[in-house]
């Protein structure tokens, strides 16, 4: 390589210093240059072709202030204010840069290597700590000329275009690198600048009234703007009308589905009318949780999920297709879930709307007013929206099946609750013309369906199935108006509860009646007591004859239509024991028993109205035709309640005459006597005995003849014969026959057993012999005329034989009194025995066998459930799936509930299962009763089979006792008051032991029983906190584990506290039971304090622990709220 080549390579390797191109020298901008550039703005505008040649003074000042503030406040970010810096630089370049700016540029060229792309602080400037602290150091920006020129040109064009069209809002900074959203609120410096210029908030508020433009006000809305507004309103009305029509079509489709439902929901499917027969499987029928009706499980219902309001958990529920569609239409698709009310809708047909406005005179509006177009609708065309107006302007049209007593209220009466179509009660005036739902939860679908019930439901082919107990009222105790209201309200309530409207009452002549027809009762002309009493007596006469004619044809007194009377026996999947049967010939029921709960014990399932087919073989007892003394006295002392229906006195007297003489003797029915004082409500046992003997003898001799239906009725007033001899007899019989003939003695008591049947029969036989001998002496030896059978009706003592005084005052002639021969003692004894046995039916519900043992040392009640026999068949396959529940009454039923296992498909289950109650003290043993309930487990809910009760005070300590008891109907359960709940917080079992070798106190937390449920589910998540006070160490505090969802937790945990033995008498052991909660403080259930100064068992246990170290001392303590 030559020397010249090497020299060339060396020159190439040497790094040449970078030089700034001469064509585009960098420009340094300082605060001084920016101030000088502001004076040359007019020159820049002229050179760039401004049409006006110069800008206004205000716009110059605005631009200069903005650029100066931008360069001063943010010197370290030249890119964000590039537009402002470029504008100032361009103005300086075109008009001639100032002397300071050129000098600064030369200074930057000579020696500064750090001036590129970075702000510089001039070294010639004095420090801020000098004589002038307010002066800030000079800041320089190095910008390229092409970038400055481009941004200047764009910004200048924007300013010039603003003179001809849309104005540009400089306060939004979108031209200078800010956001392009024109609705962004300006910053504080922009507002401050506009306040100085008095230009308003923004450019768009320039036309508003202000101190500077108060005279330049624009006019009103133009015609074009008004037309545009009207188009928008018309479009909104059109969309609203379409939405109303859409909801109306869905509601109409739902109503058509309800009309096509022809089944009764009990023995037949509600939708397809398929009968649930004995050959069909039980799974084919399922009950809807909303309407409580049975439908086919496969084709007529759907399973869906729902949130339980009490537990908050998602559960699987079964709905019929009607209720499922109602949920979709009335809650989801209609938008009611959002508005919390049912919106307005239009029906597609021309029928009357659901809610029709009522004028002041009570008539419907005429067709012209109903056809008035809606205001705001274009042209007024289209159907009227059928709104649901508020209660202030319109009255809700109630269905025909609603009772008259609730028709005046805005809502329907549901189950005796508040008058409202909503579940929680009141119907609020929403102002939107709709039904407002409660905001807390979704309303019941049945309540919404009833709230929008149409007017033509009487045409529905759905039959009416009404239980007999609905109309079991004493007819004579009501006036004309009260009876009609009560009857209609009872009929309406039974079907409001099920969500199915009932038909209008068909007052037709019964099919089985062959006697003379009754004429309609004339309406009362006045409201005086005399006229009301006369109308009452007339109607009662008609009612007694009609009821006597169809006694064995139907049990419904209001409706005898063929479609409401079942043609076959009930094969319902749910056969109710406690509910009286609605089968046509099943009228034999014991009314002497107390009123039983006719609904399910477990799940609140409404039982069916049909009883078991096995009950059809029972004979008709006379107790269903005879008033009972204790039932009436119970009604009298209770002061309220509707008494049960009793037999007619004319039929009873005629039966007495038939059974005695063997001939058909007709006695006139007594009229209704005037209402007497409550003192006349009691009758002697002789009257009850005479009625039982006479009616029972008639039943035993096969006398099914209908007496008093076709014979002429005599209108004679009867009075009770007051004879001293008979009063003496009554006083004697009260002490002799009250126990033998009382309804509770005749029926199975709660401590009766099948082994006691022989004793009861012997006792009844002895009572019958004494009564017959007394009756024989009375009828043959006494001088006074014989006493006729006395009937008691709603507290009125009515005799079937008139006295001579009343007869002479009315007819002035003596009426011949037929003599009644004495019934032989043997026949009467058999009749009364059969009557009492059929009335009480001691084995009709079966029996149960179990043993009980009370261990006094451990405070434990041990139960051994053995078996049950002859239970009722509640399933369609002829069997039941029985299980047993135990409760301790009175007390918290949920805390004391014990449940046995379920034996499937049997009527004679064998359990052989042992269960125990802990913490049963001597006080509990004397006060509490063990309730034993037998239930049939089903897919949804449970059916009641029977129950019995055992008093714990009958048990001996540490001795096993066997019970074989008859099952009875459901008895009322006493409810705890708030005071009792606060007192009874539960019990805890604690063991104490002091170990001298370790110097520690051991506390055993064994278990708690009968705790109070603190959560919304009725349960608690309990745990214990234990502390030894006064606290000298952190180790003297401890707590147990948490037991989830229980009221009887069992811990069996041991806690250890190190404490000297000599300090124990001064210490106090504090134990508290708490309910664990998430997200809030734990609830305090109760606690105890153990110390030497404590009372009762608490002090004794602590003293025993101190006196006997090394010995475990256990005791039960009752928790207190204020411990």
From Swiss-Prot:
GO MF term set = small GTPase binding; zinc ion binding
Q: Which residues does the annotation say bind Ca(2+) 2?
A: 875, 936, 938, 943
ZnF segments: FYVE-type: 263-328
Record-level GO BP terms: calcium-dependent activation of synaptic vesicle fusion; dense core granule exocytosis; intracellular protein transport; positive regulation of calcium ion-dependent exocytosis; positive regulation of locomotion
Q: Quote the biased-composition stretches of kind Polar residues, using this chain's numbering.
A: 365-375, 387-400, 410-428, 487-497, 605-632, 649-666
Residue spans of biased composition, Basic and acidic residues class: 531-541, 756-768
Residues holding Ca(2+) 4: 1015, 1075, 1077, 1083
Q: Which UniProt keywords apply?
A: Calcium, Exocytosis, Metal-binding, Repeat, Synapse, Zinc, Zinc-finger
Binding-site residues, Zn(2+) 1 = 269, 272, 296, 300
Q: Where is the RabBD domain?
A: 215-341
Which sites bind Zn(2+) 2?
Answer: 288, 291, 320, 323
Q: Where is the composition biased (Basic residues)?
A: 1-17
List the GO terms this entry assigns under cellular component, sorted alphabetically.
membrane; synapse; synaptic vesicle
Renumbered residue ranges of the record's region Disordered: 1-56, 88-140, 365-710, 737-779, 796-818
Domain C2, residue spans = 844-967, 984-1103
Q: Which CDD domains match?
A: C2A_Rabphilin_Doc2, C2B_Rabphilin_Doc2, FYVE_RP3A_like
From what superkingdom does this record's organism come? Answer: Eukaryota
Protein location: Synapse
Q: Where does Ca(2+) 3 bind?
A: 1015, 1021, 1075, 1077
Which co-factors does it depend on? Ca(2+)
UniProt biased composition (Low complexity): 36-46, 563-574, 742-753, 803-818
Q: Which residues bind Ca(2+) 1?
A: 875, 881, 936, 938
InterPro entries tied to this protein: C2_dom (IPR000008), C2_domain_sf (IPR035892), FYVE_2 (IPR041282), FYVE_RBF-1 (IPR030541), Rab_BD (IPR010911), Rabphilin/DOC2/Noc2 (IPR043566), Rabphilin_Doc2_C2A (IPR047022), Synaptotagmin (IPR001565)
Function as written in the Swiss-Prot or TrEMBL entry: Rab-3 effector.
UniProt name for this protein: Rabphilin-1
Originating gene? rbf-1
